[in-house]
Amino acid sequence: MFSTGTVWKNVAAVRQRAPIIHSITNFVVMNTTANALLAAGASPIMAHAPEEMAEMAGIASALVLNIGTLTKPWVESMMLAGMAARERRLPVVLDPVGAGASSLRTTTALEILEKVRPAVVRGNGSEILALAGAAGDTRGVDSARTAHEAVDGGRALARRYGAVVVVSGAEDVVTDGDALWLVRGGSPLMPRVTGMGCTATVLVAAHVAVAADVLEGAVTGMAAMSAAGALAARRSQGPGSFQVAFLDVLHSLDLVTVRDEVEVVRA
């Protein structure tokens, strides 16, 4: 069971160890996710030149591949980085932004799954269903499906690729193909701010880098995200002030907030 103590242990470990998270991510969220990693205590590198991918794998603690604003050169960099990480046994977290919305996105995400074998896939319900082979009803990069509607697809995807799958929603779902964990917390304000899903992805990567195992890191990363989001929402007046409050809360996240603002249960 993942207790409050487990979540807090990994929150503290990220601060103590400052894992380097190499993120090849989209233009929309570079600043947002880098600042979130810094607030959590991790160290971001936002490199994407093909020529430096192997070197980045030599210093990183985890790799994030986010397909939000794809171009062919970025796909090349993602594959080079992913293969270098796999060779070094670094955990890779895939964020299949908009999978199902275009053939480029879906094909690229599936290629990463096949060749890189990421440790974690974190997406919304529609993205996960699209990768699992079901009709995901993706609306651009937004989801038309709830996390619970994608449970079966998430389990199938996890079993097929040996990954932990995180399905974000009002209640987050985390599965390794067998066990199913629910993370309850957060705020309705979170989907009103661009980059919150991508932020969850990098926090999962930071937690996986320090956790006892991948499943634990995925669960505690999402729990930290939910706890910070819940408290930040109460301290803000709307989406604009929420962004600032979220970083402040993430930076000062403590055991009491984790205990009071998030619930992790096994389904």
UniProtKB/Swiss-Prot annotation:
EC category: transferase
Keyword Metal-binding attached: yes
Binding site for ATP: 122, 168
A biological process term (GO) from this entry: thiamine biosynthetic process
Named cofactor requirement(s): Mg(2+)
UniProt catalytic activity: 5-(2-hydroxyethyl)-4-methylthiazole + ATP = 4-methyl-5-(2-phosphooxyethyl)-thiazole + ADP + H(+)
Transmembrane domains' residue ranges: none
Enzyme Commission number(s): 2.7.1.50
Record bears the keyword Thylakoid: no
Binding positions for substrate per the UniProt entry: 46, 195
Pathway, per record: Cofactor biosynthesis; thiamine diphosphate biosynthesis; 4-methyl-5-(2-phosphoethyl)-thiazole from 5-(2-hydroxyethyl)-4-methylthiazole: step 1/1
Example GO molecular function: hydroxyethylthiazole kinase activity
Keywords of this entry: ATP-binding, Kinase, Magnesium, Metal-binding, Nucleotide-binding, Thiamine biosynthesis, Transferase
Function: Catalyzes the phosphorylation of the hydroxyl group of 4-methyl-5-beta-hydroxyethylthiazole (THZ).
HAMAP family linked to this entry: Thz_kinase
Family indicated by similarity: Belongs to the Thz kinase family.
Listed name of the protein: Hydroxyethylthiazole kinase
Gene name of this polypeptide: thiM
